[in-house]
Amino acid sequence: MPIPFHPLDLTDMASVRQRVKDTECRNCDLNFLNLFSWRFLYDTEIAIHNDHLLFRFKADGHRAYLAPVGESDWKDVVPDLLDDAARDGHPFLMLGVCEHSLKKLEETMPGYFYANADRRYTDYIYDRQSLATLAGKKLQPKRNFANRFTRLYPNHTYAPLTPEDIEECLELHATWTEAKGKEDDAGRYTYEAERKSLLRVMEHWNELDACGGVLRVNGQMVAFTYGAPVNHDTFDVCMEKADTNFEGAFAFINRSFVQSLPEKFIYINREEDLGIPGLRQSKISYHPSLLLHKYTVMTRHPMQG
């Protein structure tokens, strides 16, 4: 049966959040804020099909899918996804597949798929209490950074992020980008795409029901962050930027933002490291409680649907 995909837009938000909220899925790919703000890059489409939430998108020029969201029998949807790919002449490709979904695919069609893990897209998930307190010996270096920021910049303020902060956020993103450097075309592409995603979030801030924080020193924005829930107990931090000239700004805003979140969120997803060595080192240094591995799934006969 053909799947009624349509371009994802804001009218899909309630349906996505309702269907993901009560699952145990903590994958940042299913955060509606991410799906919406990066749609320009992936041409993301959505469908409700046989009581399952389905996503279709483009990645590096290839047609791809996310794993179905729905706990009932996947035999009602997986064959239709295979047919959808075959109908358009595309090899079947499913990205960001967690181990739970990988098991369901195998149960649905035993021996039909094979999967490869891609460490670049592993989600780093942390215990909320650890990030909110930075307590203990393992996190002492982070605690020291945050406390140093307090000592060095006594005139700092932390406040919720609002749509009125958009210009300052864009300026700080540009400052951060220059500090990181644009060493190659791939890096430049990434930064420019990220800026576009940021702009899209800020323009639709209230509709997206996003949550964020702003750190200032003497009235100057030196860091900002924002995110949105994935499910009932996991909050996804989608973006965090700081002026590296202000020592400890990253550690301080990380801690302050987590402290401000509702207590029902006991896990904090800080997303992937994309294979960037410095980013990987930074995420590991906060000692995640879970590494959510994700897989690329294809059929054993690529052109078979």
Label for each model-derived stretch:
Residues 110-188:
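Acyltransferase donor/substrate-recognition loop-hinge adjacent to the catalytic core
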Residues 1-56, 303-305:
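Non-cleavable N-terminal signal-anchor transmembrane helices
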Residues 101-116, 144, 274-291:
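Conserved active-site alpha-helix within GNAT-family acetyltransferase domains
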Residues 164, 168-220:
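Short, conserved active-site entrance elements at the starts or edges of catalytic domains
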Residues 93-94, 159, 267-270:
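Short catalytic-loop micro-motif centered on adjacent basic/acidic residues
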Residues 209-300:
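Aromatic (often tryptophan-rich) hydrophobic motifs at membrane interfaces
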Residues 28-101, 216-244:
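Conserved donor-binding loop and adjoining core beta-sheet/short helix segment
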Residues 16, 149, 283:
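A residue-level signal for conserved active-site and pocket-lining positions in enzyme catalytic cores
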